[in-house]
Amino acid sequence: MRAAVVAVGARALGTLQRGRTPASYRKRSSIVLVLLPPSEGKADSGRGAPLKPESLSLPGLAEARAAVLDELVELCVTDEEKAREVLGLSEGLRGEIAKNTELRVAGARPAGDIYTGVLYDALGLATLDAVAKRRATKALLVFSGLWGAVRINDRIPSYRCSMGVKLPGLGALGAYWRGPMAEALPEAAGDGLVLDLRSSAYANAWKPKGELAERTATVRVLHAQMVNGVEKRSVVSHFNKATKGRLVRDLLMAGAKPAGPGELVTVLRDLGYVVEAEAPGRAGRAWALDVVVTEIH
């Protein structure tokens, strides 16, 4: 359990290069739902058709989305300085406020193109093969302070509004989204495994409960280093994000559909990851997985 691990192990690399997936993984029919955080920075919307709110996935979130959109645009249109304070923007990011004022008319792009940063660079959606891209469209759900949650093929404009924001009239968005999410997310999860890779602010917006929690696995990435002959482990943001992105990519490329957290551990180990698992101590709790890394290439 102390061996070094890179994003893709030798066994995994051989499997993917040969285009084979273990038969036990291919037989599964249930969809794994992967919960991701958004990126703080985002790609420009570019030109194109504007947002069509009615076209977004999870229509049960439509009313809540409209309310957040209204409050955000109103704030940014009427009081730029207050908007900068509420959104937690530095002076150099003041231009993000102008983007928010144009959310209803700005060009919209697939969310998978909008979100950038370490996790999404490692995930590499644009370089997945066609089959893996279809899997990603079904499996990935990106949480958002503005939209609640979207699929990667949902077309959205670039925006600035994190889950930690407190909007006038709505309050803290993490708390605001809990009710709508509690209604919409269990249906999206279906009866399959939920792989929760969200950061704490976004995890606060929805926590699986009951039987659904028992088939949910959260992942923590630990960086292991030898210090004076003793192994020390810590959470390092870059390693955490990059490893999660590559882990999702490997699962998509392998076509793995583990039926539950225990089988997920087996799949990840087969893909070359060093995984330590802790089953929940009581009913209605999620599994906690630690992925231990020493370096990222």
Q: Model-predicted segments: where are they?
A:
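Compositionally biased, low-complexity flexible segments
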Residues: 1-23
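Residue-level marker of intrinsically disordered, low-complexity segments enriched
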Residues: 3-6, 29, 289
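Short, Lys/Arg-enriched N-terminal segments with co-localized hydrophobic residues
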Residues: 16-31, 239
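Intrinsically disordered, low-complexity boundary segments flanking structured domains
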Residues: 20-25, 100-107, 181-184, 203-209
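Intrinsic-disorder/low-complexity coil detector
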Residues: 21, 52, 58, 257-260, ...
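Near-N-terminal "mature-domain entry" segment
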Residues: 30-161, 165, 176, 253, ...
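Internal, well-folded beta-alpha domain core
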Residues: 125-297
